[in-house]
From Swiss-Prot:
Keyword field contains Zinc: yes
Subunit organization: Component of the small ribosomal subunit. Part of the small subunit (SSU) processome, composed of more than 70 proteins and the RNA chaperone small nucleolar RNA (snoRNA) U3.
Protein family: Belongs to the eukaryotic ribosomal protein eS27 family.
CC cofactor note: Binds 1 zinc ion per subunit.
MF GO annotations: RNA binding; structural constituent of ribosome; zinc ion binding
Source domain of life: Eukaryota
Bias (Basic and acidic residues) ranges: 1-16
This protein's UniProt keywords: Cytoplasm, Metal-binding, Nucleus, Ribonucleoprotein, Ribosomal protein, Zinc, Zinc-finger
ZnF (C4-type) intervals: 37-59
Protein name per Swiss-Prot or TrEMBL: Small ribosomal subunit protein eS27
Signal peptide start and end residues: none
HAMAP family xref list: Ribosomal_eS27
Length: 84
């Protein structure tokens, strides 16, 4: 383990593990994502840390359920992280 550590140029892996406020440039851990319903294949935009149950617009199946942090996707649902 080296004693000299470059604080101005941390590796991307180190930055990801840090708290969102203690990073070199602050950035949130949350994101929006497109979730595809396994039944009717409609796409719904869902927040990653959703605090309520999200239902499909077309067939009213449950797409994700809240946990203490990130929302848990239902089995069979596929998602894609939205670009900002």
């Amino acid at each position: 383990m080296p004693l000299a550590k470059d604080l101005l140029h941390p590796t991307p892996e180190e930055e990801k593990r840090k708290h969102k406020k203690k990073r070199l440039v602050q950035s949130p851990n949350s994101y929006f994502m497109d979730v595809k319903c396994p039944g009717c294949y409609k796409i719904t935009t869902v927040f990653s840390h959703a605090q309520t149950v999200v239902l499909c617009v077309g067939c009213s199946t449950v797409l994700c359920q809240p946990t203490g942090g990130k929302a848990r996707l239902t089995e069979g649902c596929s998602f894609r992280r939205k670009q900002h």
